[in-house]
């Protein structure tokens, strides 16, 4: 009878300690520093990311137009605008 009681007591103690440790580690404030020497900023890579996003958005716009059976009329990444033509694809 003593063995199950000791086991349950240890289980409760261990579970309470782990929950305290988990809550303590998640409450810590995390700071991220940027070191230009360690990782230099490359504006061309940012420009490439924007181009990829623009191409991806317009590609999705074109697919949506084709699903409707229409031609693509306007695709504006900056304004998030996708318009298709009135005429159907022949």
UniProtKB/Swiss-Prot annotation:
Known tissue expression: Expressed in the pistil. Detected exclusively in the synergid cells.
Signal peptide range: 1-19
One cellular component term from this protein's GO annotations in UniProt: extracellular region
Compartments reported by the entry: Secreted
Entry keyword Cell membrane: no
Predominant localisation class: secreted
Keywords linked to the UniProt accession: Disulfide bond, Secreted, Signal
Top-rank taxon: Eukaryota
Consequence of substituting residue 84 to C: Gain of pollen tube attraction activity
Residue ranges the record marks as coiled coil: none
Family annotation (InterPro entries): DEFL_AtLURE1-like
Disulfide bridge partners, by residue number: 58-75, 61-82
Family as reported in the entry's similarity comment: Belongs to the DEFL family.
Summary of the function given for this chain in its UniProt record: Inactive pollen tube attractants guiding pollen tubes to the ovular micropyle.
Protein name: Protein LURE 1.5
Species this protein is from: Arabidopsis thaliana (Mouse-ear cress)
